[in-house]
């Protein structure tokens, strides 16, 4: 009986061993199957479309490069990451500024179209050669609403120019893949009142906005007799409007250029809203010799950081006293931080 029991136990043990081996093989086979499936899925899973995500490491690297070894701790500014499709800091914008109704307001409108576009292309190439790490792209920065000495019928001291000229500028820009900026001088009006008049254009992905505090005369002075001012609340009115347009129309981020060359032109800069939908450029807008322009940039742009910086060059006023008075790309790239938006007037 004992021998018989031992034989049964031996048989059961052998069966259990075989069963364990079989189970392990099954688990191993299952694991291999899962691994193969995972490997297969990792190959066949749909990748995001180009531009549907942002490479934050690349963005950070570019922002650090723009800060140009700043030691003050102000740059780069800590802001939310932009939405995919952002222009900055991946590109440097080279813009020609002006108005088609006047030859005195800038290079855009001062000389014939073909000559102007050729000159713009030359400036873009100079910047591309000076900084090969950042793609230089052209832009036409058109003054769509101009401040006026006369009050006009509504007493707002501003003139909204005909949209057909905006259409013309856009028709010039698109064949050369240039951006378009529409600039607003509010006079005695407000940003909140004026920006919506350009909505149909701002809904276009290649059209952006500029606002000029110099011609915002809240105190009642006639534009051109005093330098105006905008508070962060005024600038935020533009940002909020652009943010909504981007969200509602699923657009890439808009660029907002804010001109500045005095302390009083922008107040409460720390309260300027930065959001993923809008990229803010504070543009050094003053003319004069190199020492004056650099001082203006360092005092009002570098010292009061918002997000990105710009620098305006004047073909005539900058060289009035010195034929070599206009900054070169190489010289401007030594500034801290480096400007990412360059405007010619």
Model feature map: region roles:
Residues 2-10:
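Bacterial N-terminal signal peptides that target proteins for export
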Residues 186-191, 247-265:
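Aromatic-lined carbohydrate-recognition surfaces of secreted/lumenal glycan-active proteins
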Residues 19-22:
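C-terminal motif of bacterial Sec signal peptides marking the signal peptidase cleavage site
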Residues 126-128, 135-214:
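Substrate-binding cleft of extracellular glycoside hydrolase catalytic domains
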């Amino acid at each position: 009986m004992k021998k018989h029991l031992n034989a049964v136990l031996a048989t059961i043990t052998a069966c259990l061993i075989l069963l364990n081996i079989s189970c392990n093989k099954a688990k191993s086979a299952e694991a291999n199957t899962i691994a193969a499936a995972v490997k297969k899925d990792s190959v066949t899973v749909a990748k995001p479309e180009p531009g549907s995500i942002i490479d934050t490491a690349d963005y950070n690297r570019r922002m650090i490069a723009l800060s140009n070894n700043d030691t003050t701790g102000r740059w780069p500014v800590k802001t939310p990451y932009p939405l995919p499709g952002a222009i900055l800091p991946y590109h440097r914008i080279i813009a020609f500024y002006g108005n088609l109704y006047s030859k005195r307001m800038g290079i855009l409108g001062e000389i014939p179209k073909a000559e102007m576009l050729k000159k713009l292309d030359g400036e873009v190439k100079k910047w591309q050669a000076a900084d090969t790490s950042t793609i230089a792209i052209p832009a036409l920065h058109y003054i769509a609403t101009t401040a006026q000495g006369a009050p006009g019928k509504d007493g707002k001291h501003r003139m909204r120019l005909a949209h057909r000229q905006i259409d013309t500028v856009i028709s010039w820009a698109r064949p050369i893949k240039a951006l378009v900026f529409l600039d607003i001088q509010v006079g005695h009006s407000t940003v909140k009142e004026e920006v919506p008049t350009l909505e149909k254009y701002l809904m276009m992905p290649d059209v952006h906005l500029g606002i000029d505090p110099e011609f915002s005369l809240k105190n009642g002075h006639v534009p051109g007799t005093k330098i105006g001012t905008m508070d962060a609340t005024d600038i935020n009115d533009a940002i909020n409007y652009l943010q909504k347009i981007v969200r509602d129309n699923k657009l890439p981020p808009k660029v907002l250029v804010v001109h500045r060359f005095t302390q009083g032109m922008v107040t409460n800069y720390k309260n300027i809203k930065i959001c993923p939908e809008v990229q803010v450029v504070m543009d050094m807008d003053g003319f004069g010799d190199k020492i004056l322009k650099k001082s203006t940039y360092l005092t009002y742009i570098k010292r009061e950081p918002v997000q990105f910086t710009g620098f305006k060059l004047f073909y005539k006023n900058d060289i009035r006293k010195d034929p070599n008075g206009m900054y070169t790309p190489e010289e401007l790239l030594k500034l801290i931080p480096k400007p990412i938006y360059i405007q010619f007037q």
